[in-house]
Amino acid sequence: MIQVPSTLNVADNTGVKKLKCIKVLGGSRRRYATLGDVIICSVTDIIPTCSIEKGKVVKAVIVRVKKEVRRPDGSYIRFDENAAVIVDDKKEPRGKRIFGPVARELRDRGFMKIVSLAPEVI
């Protein structure tokens, strides 16, 4: 459950380390975002060689959340951190590598490129 002031780690190699959620896409009154949702974020922390400047507004897809998510078979999944992958307007990842596991829900949402780059799909 990601809402407007939430901070997220970045799970790709774009050079951005932390993001801050500034908008949840998908409706004018939508409050929370979960696995596979696209959000608008502000870049809050970067590494020195990053091509994206601090303060830049980017779109990101949520790949890991701390809050447990119920699956259709009745099982639950949760992670140790909130993490996202920066994407462009075509919903393709801007980085060339994905770090850490990603949820299987991304495949259902149509983010096949992120799923194929990830080292593990849970």
From Swiss-Prot:
<dbReference type="GO" id="GO:0003735">
    <property type="term" value="F:structural constituent of ribosome"/>
</dbReference>
<keyword id="KW-0689">Ribosomal protein</keyword>
<comment type="subunit">
    <text>Part of the 50S ribosomal subunit. Forms a cluster with proteins L3 and L19. In the 70S ribosome, L14 and L19 interact and together make contacts with the 16S rRNA in bridges B5 and B8.</text>
</comment>
<dbReference type="InterPro" id="IPR036853">
    <property type="entry name" value="Ribosomal_uL14_sf"/>
</dbReference>
<keyword id="KW-0694">RNA-binding</keyword>
<dbReference type="Pfam" id="PF00238">
    <property type="entry name" value="Ribosomal_L14"/>
</dbReference>
<keyword id="KW-0699">rRNA-binding</keyword>
<dbReference type="InterPro" id="IPR000218">
    <property type="entry name" value="Ribosomal_uL14"/>
</dbReference>
<dbReference type="InterPro" id="IPR005745">
    <property type="entry name" value="Ribosomal_uL14_bac-type"/>
</dbReference>
<protein>
    <recommendedName>
        <fullName>Large ribosomal subunit protein uL14</fullName>
    </recommendedName>
</protein>
<dbReference type="InterPro" id="IPR019972">
    <property type="entry name" value="Ribosomal_uL14_CS"/>
</dbReference>
<keyword id="KW-0687">Ribonucleoprotein</keyword>
<dbReference type="GO" id="GO:0006412">
    <property type="term" value="P:translation"/>
</dbReference>
<dbReference type="GO" id="GO:0070180">
    <property type="term" value="F:large ribosomal subunit rRNA binding"/>
</dbReference>
<comment type="function">
    <text>Binds to 23S rRNA. Forms part of two intersubunit bridges in the 70S ribosome.</text>
</comment>
<dbReference type="GO" id="GO:0022625">
    <property type="term" value="C:cytosolic large ribosomal subunit"/>
</dbReference>
<comment type="similarity">
    <text>Belongs to the universal ribosomal protein uL14 family.</text>
</comment>
